Amino acid sequence: MGQGLSQPAQAVEEPSPPAVEAAPSSSPSPAPAPSSLEALAAEAMSFDEDGNESIDVKVQKALDCPCVAELKNGPCGSQFVDAFSCFLKSTEEEKGSDCVKPFIALQDCIKINPEAFSKEILEEEENDEEAEKSNLKVRAPAWSRESKPKL
């Protein structure tokens, strides 16, 4: 979840991955971490899916998916629920771009509670921040680059 504070959820709308069928399980073992928010959303939205339900009912069922239980019940649960719900309900062309505030709140909570998250999530955030910094270029102002007349 390594978005910059001035950036929306970096969720680029791509074709949705195929729906993943939730295999019935007798033990509530934690699911492996999905590679992206889109994958997590697709998995959660396919949980107990019924095409004739309102978006609010679909979001609630997605939040009931075991694939998000650890995030929902952790120390940043309310921030996760707000951000994830907003992302699922988003109708913007760039999915989730209208959810900046909830994702910033989630990001802030993750920074305050790093012990509650896997190293994989925290490293992903650090890598995103490093990549963002490496894309920055410092250029001298135009006035300083202009040639000065010789006297």
UniProtKB/Swiss-Prot annotation:
A motif (Cx9C motif 2) lies at residues 99-109. Disulfide bonds join C65-C67, C76-C109, C86-C99. A motif (Cx9C motif 1) lies at residues 76-86. The keyword Glycoprotein does not apply. InterPro entries: CHCHD4 (IPR039289). Residues 1-35, 123-151 are annotated as: Disordered. Residues 7-26 have a biased composition (Low complexity). GO terms for biological process: protein import into mitochondrial intermembrane space; protein targeting to peroxisome. It comes from the Eukaryota. Residues 73-117 form the CHCH domain. Gene3D superfamilies: 1.10.287.2900. It is found in: Mitochondrion intermembrane space; Peroxisome matrix. One of its GO terms (cellular component) is peroxisomal matrix. Keywords: Disulfide bond, Mitochondrion, Oxidoreductase, Peroxisome, Protein transport, Redox-active center, Translocation, Transport. Required for the import and folding of small cysteine-containing proteins in the mitochondrial intermembrane space. PANTHER family: COILED-COIL-HELIX-COILED-COIL-HELIX DOMAIN CONTAINING 4. This is Mitochondrial intermembrane space import and assembly protein 40 homolog. It comes from Oryza sativa subsp. japonica. The lineage of its organism: Eukaryota, Viridiplantae, Streptophyta, Embryophyta, Tracheophyta. The gene is MIA40.
